[in-house]
Amino acid sequence: MGGGVGSRFWPYSRESKPKQFLDIFGTGRSLLQMTFDRFSKVIPKENFVIVTNATYRDLVLEQLPELQPSQLLLEPMRRNTAPCIGWATYHIQAKNPKANIIVTPADHLILQEDVFEEAIKQALAFVAQHPQLVTLGVRPSRPETGYGYIQITGETEGGFVQVKTFTEKPNLEMAKVFLESGEFLWNSGMFARNVQTILDAFHRYLPSLTSILDEVNGHYAQSEEQQHVGAIFSQCPNISIDYAVLEKADNVMVLPVDFGWADLGTWGSLYDLKKAEDKANVALHTEALFYEAEGNIISMDGEGDQLVVVQGINDCIISQSNGVLLICKRGEEQRIKEFMAEASLRFDKRYD
């Protein structure tokens, strides 16, 4: 899944080039390319399916020249993750009715890739033998308010644990309770399933989607697929896979994992990943000098050498990209979407 805007990373992530297409760490590979590299060790290249917004077709093909245009499913508009995954499932079933599928966002970071590879193989092997949905749950290391959580029961099967509930992003006090209880895992947003298992779940829990996608039966994995789905996609419900299916289904298992995972959804998550110690400053794509300043993250997007000097500022996001300079307290970063919306309204979308 690679069609989001990444608005919480504004102004570095923009409508024209969202964060999944950016080389955030200066490695020469974007988050999308790093995700592709990671899964290429497990999945044949010809079996990849990228669901993205139609606007990003050329960007995807430019960054992933290994893929054919037919491996891209181009959404004419954003309708959240349930329609995205639903369309991909119908497409894959038309090509292979017995396929086992792993779903992943395009913008996550994995530090221990060997451990990750084994977890993916384990999940795919499980769903090939069991009519269950398997999500990957990350063992929490801190009381994190930026992630959803999965509560587990004590019922296990070969390392897989029965899911009790899915919980949305908690406040700090509740996140501390979750951590101390030992009953909760971070929801990584990655899950595996057999194609028929997830189709059955969609038909049972989200018939408002399947009734629409069923109209295209006979055209999936054909040259006219894009045209037919594009004509009906606006009718699909705007809902996440978690709300639509996973929170309702009674056949969801979780594989607890620990492979150095991070959902790079916010400046705060990037700061936590890059900081050397508590209250340290972080500078990306620039040289920096700090005086009486701590807990800041700086990101400068520009050509050539750059230097930023910061004095007397604590716990801030300082980011410059494509004509926009953002200075915002890290504790207020949930307002970045608000800032972006106001800028779009006042300045005719020049800074989206």
Which role does the model predict for each range below?
Residues 45-46, 68-69, 96-99, 129-133, ...:
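Short coil/turn connectors at secondary-structure junctions
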Residues 32, 88, 107, 150, ...:
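Residue-level signal for inorganic ion chemistry
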Residues 195-352:
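Left-handed beta-helix
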Residues 1-2, 51, 102-105, 135-139, ...:
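Short beta-strand segments
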Residues 50, 73-74, 103, 134-138, ...:
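General beta-strand structural signal in soluble alpha/beta enzymes
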Residues 8-15, 26-105, 111-115, 121:
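Conserved N-terminal catalytic core of the sugar/cofactor nucleotidyltransferase
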Residues 113-233, 253, 330:
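Conserved core of the sugar-phosphate nucleotidyltransferase
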